[in-house]
Amino acid sequence: MDTNNNIEKEILALVKQNPKVSLIEYENYLSQLKYNPNASKSDIAFFYAPNKFLCTTITAKYGALLKEILSQNKVGMHLAHSVDVRIEVAPKIQVNAQSNINYKATKTSVKDSYTFENFVVGSCNNTVYEIAKKVAQSDTPPYNPVLFYGGTGLGKTHILNAIGNHALEKHKKVVLVTSEDFLTDFLKHLDNKNMDSFKKKYRHCDFFLLDDAQFLQGKPKLEEEFFHTFNELHANSKQIVLISDRSPKNIAGLEDRLKSRFEWGITAKVMPPDLETKLSIVKQKCQLNKITLPEEVMEYIAQHISDNIRQMEGAIIKISVNANLMNATIDLNLAKTVLEDLQKDHAEGSSLENILLAVAQSLNLKSSEIKVSSRQKNVALARKLVVYFARLYTPNPTLSLAQFLDLKDHSSISKMYSSVKKMLEEEKSPFILSLREEIKNRLNELNDKKTAFNSSE
């Protein structure tokens, strides 16, 4: 008879090969199952899932499929014509006091709630997810450093914490810190003349995870310290993962030697979620917050609230709270009324400078590159997008817009606007549609923070 290990491998192999199971579904959900041979019988297969969320999700979505696979394929001791499947949450393993202390000592600001299991994967973030999982699972860095970048609220911090949590499960030493906290800690140790302690804390870890790396810019002493921290970690094959709101070359004021090191390994962009992924996120947030919404309300949130995941979750909670306060039934009309203020387009009234900055960041260009006519495709597209958003959101006349982009022929403005509109409305280019949402998100952020372009130069 097969060993228990072989039985588990055989079952998972059959699941992975099944045409009804995508690779993403297998990696995200079904690969997490552990076969329980002690409870299993000839007509019942018992499995453990690592947490309640996965247990519920796999049972609901894949329970029938697992039953079908095991009934059709005689695996191990399952010989009945019809095999039932039971999935339970795995019992927690007890560790001795000393190992528990060491485990906690390695945990620096890693949020337990952010895991790979509850990260919603779609076409917008699949590459980032696969890279992050490979990094977390590897004993030696497969890429070093790793830098993920993209707009606010797209899941970058979630994926960073997921890496940290997975590493902690393997009893690795993990340091997760924002660049602002790194600065605060640096200044405190510097003031106390205790830099040896600072270096020991940040240079003697297996995983160094830095959030908001763009805030290192313009702080020479901090950049110097981070430069040496980076070098020592890299030289000792310790994994470095960085999160930023823009690509390294677009972090203005960051030393060139740091930009160069940020690009040593692999850089990946987190794109705004498509509608299908947004709907999956809304459903997951409802489940996590134990809020029940009608399908049409969840679809409405996915369609009309921005791509920012935190705003989507806020919309869900706002609907629930208002329904409870008014003792009302949650329906589409209630959702529209409650969420009216969240749907206001903050991009209205944008300055030309903010539009230029948002487009530049989204296409990894410098603002100065866009203001000059060029035959390079990405620059030409950027100039068209500036015109498109300027026509939508600013009262600037064609003449001032032409001057802003150094266009001699004012009629070019209409042609550039029509070109983008055609790509969006007729061709429905997925890339341009996604890019439009990203630029709008960046404009919303710039306008909400009242960030002036001139003050950022």
UniProtKB/Swiss-Prot annotation:
Plays an essential role in the initiation and regulation of chromosomal replication. ATP-DnaA binds to the origin of replication (oriC) to initiate formation of the DNA replication initiation complex once per cell cycle. Binds the DnaA box (a 9 base pair repeat at the origin) and separates the double-stranded (ds)DNA. Forms a right-handed helical filament on oriC DNA; dsDNA binds to the exterior of the filament while single-stranded (ss)DNA is stabiized in the filament's interior. It is found in: Cytoplasm. One of its GO terms (molecular function) is ATP hydrolysis activity. One of its GO terms (biological process) is regulation of DNA replication. This is Chromosomal replication initiator protein DnaA. Disulfide bonds: none annotated. Belongs to the DnaA family. Pfam families: Bac_DnaA, Bac_DnaA_C. Residues 1-77 are annotated as: Domain I, interacts with DnaA modulators. Keywords: ATP-binding, Cytoplasm, DNA replication, DNA-binding, Lipid-binding, Nucleotide-binding. GO terms for cellular component: cytoplasm; plasma membrane. Residues 109-323 are annotated as: Domain III, AAA+ region. Residues 324-457 are annotated as: Domain IV, binds dsDNA. Residues 77-108 are annotated as: Domain II. Oligomerizes as a right-handed, spiral filament on DNA at oriC. ATP binds at G153, G155, K156, T157. SMART domains: AAA, Bac_DnaA_C. Domain I is involved in oligomerization and binding regulators, domain II is flexibile and of varying length in different bacteria, domain III forms the AAA+ region, while domain IV binds dsDNA. It comes from the Bacteria. InterPro entries: AAA+_ATPase (IPR003593), Chromosome_initiator_DnaA (IPR001957), Chromosome_initiator_DnaA-like (IPR020591), Chromosome_initiator_DnaA_CS (IPR018312), DnaA_C (IPR013159), DnaA_dom (IPR013317), DnaA_N_sf (IPR038454), P-loop_NTPase (IPR027417).
